[in-house]
Amino acid sequence: MDVSNSTPVNSPATIARVWYSDKMDIPIINDSHILSFILVDHETVVQHVADDHDDIEVVSALAVAATNFSKMNDGLDTAIVHRKHSMLYYITTLALAFRLDTSIFDVIHTTVTIGDLVPTVERVPTADAVPAVYPAMAPVSPESNRDTMVQSVAVTTKEHIRRPRNQFIIYRQWMSARLHEDNPGLTAGAISSIVAKAWKGETPQVKAHFKALAVEEDRKHKLAYPGYRYQARRTRNERRKLFSTIKAVSQYPVPVTNPVLQYPVQATSSLTTADLNDPVMNLGSLNN
């Protein structure tokens, strides 16, 4: 998708949606269950059959489920997605949600915050490149200068490359989906405890199966990201500090020191969509 002329507006979800979509679909589970679980590209997706098309009601109804889903996935940001012209809604990781086909799905809710977004700004290098509507000696009011500073921290998403999962993480996501389906009332803590005990008691053959999946995922990851180095995500406090800084800039005018530099700031992004094309998990032999 060509995003060179895209102008991100509205919410952070809208921004990420423009850059990440690569026309993925989610299989439909045709049954009467309110909640069903689907494996999509090695990730668990929760399907919900709603009573009506009220997105606000659906988000409210799925709030607890979305929170537990995030805990099951190491605290990753999540999204609630609506399949257009249907009563089907999905809880997915944020990364997967923004890879879905925008002609089929709408992202109606995310847990992403402005603190997860990184400002990247490109300024025009010389006065000759300044647009004519901003002549060199044009007066600039403190109010308009403040708006320019707010634009200078215009949010653009930074692609987050996930680490390849180890054998236990793959097992945990698979087993958690089965437990949720059979016991929808279980808490995330109870599920984590059950999964840990189950993994400890699994046979070497079962563990070898998931080890093979992890090795294959690691191989695909190295091919897709040859220069990848793991970097810890921002802590909650770091995100809160960044948000406070952006909020402070938006509230106070900045003195004008060089009118030549007062011009619209354009955000740029080097984001590319990466698809590992992971093989579908062959778990048929484990379905007892």
From Swiss-Prot:
Biological-process GO terms, alphabetical: cell differentiation; negative regulation of transcription by RNA polymerase II; single fertilization
Keyword match Lipoprotein: no
InterPro entries the UniProt entry points to: HMG_box_dom, HMG_box_dom_sf, SRY-related_HMG-box_TF-like
PROSITE patterns: HMG_BOX_2
Domain of life: Eukaryota
Molecular functions per Gene Ontology: DNA-binding transcription activator activity, RNA polymerase II-specific; RNA polymerase II cis-regulatory region sequence-specific DNA binding
DNA-binding region: 161-229
UniProt keyword terms in alphabetical order: DNA-binding, Fertilization, Nucleus, Transcription
Location within or outside the cell: Nucleus
GO CC annotation terms, alphabetical: nucleus
Main subcellular location of this protein, as a coarse class: nucleus
General function of this protein: Transcription factor that is required for post-fertilization events. It is required for the developmental events that occur in the female organ after fertilization.
The protein, known as: Sporulation minus regulator 2
Organism: Podospora anserina
Organism ancestry: Eukaryota, Fungi, Dikarya, Ascomycota, Pezizomycotina
